[in-house]
C-alpha cells in the first residue's frame, strides 16, 4: 500500500491519493486506488501511467504478482490564485 501511494505522490500530475486498498489472493495481489488529479492533465494518460508504474514497481520491489490495478479519479484539483 505504501509503495503504491509513494509512486502516485511522486507524480506531479497526481495531487493526492485519497484511498488505497490491497487485497491478497493466493496467486497475487489486487490494488484499488482513488486519486485526485491536478487540473490541466489528461486524466486517461495520468491513470494509465500510474497503473503501469504501480504494477511494475510493486512487482520489482516485492516479487509479488500484481493481478490488477484499479484506479478511480475522484476529482480534479485546481490551484487557487
Which residues does each predicted region cover?
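N-terminal, polar/charged subdomain of small-to-medium soluble alpha/beta proteins
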Residues: 1-6, 10-14
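Short, non-transmembrane amphipathic alpha-helical segments
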Residues: 4, 43-65
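Preference for short coil/turn "hinge" residues that link or interrupt alpha-helices
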Residues: 7-10, 36, 57-59
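Short edge beta-strands and adjacent turn/loop segments
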Residues: 11-36, 73-78
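Short acidic, gly/pro-rich beta-turn/loop elements at beta-sheet edges
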Residues: 18, 41-45, 81
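A short interface-forming secondary-structure element
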Residues: 30-48
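A domain-level signal for the structural core that forms small-molecule/cofactor-binding pockets
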Residues: 49, 78-81
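A short amphipathic beta-strand at an alpha->beta junction
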Residues: 60-78
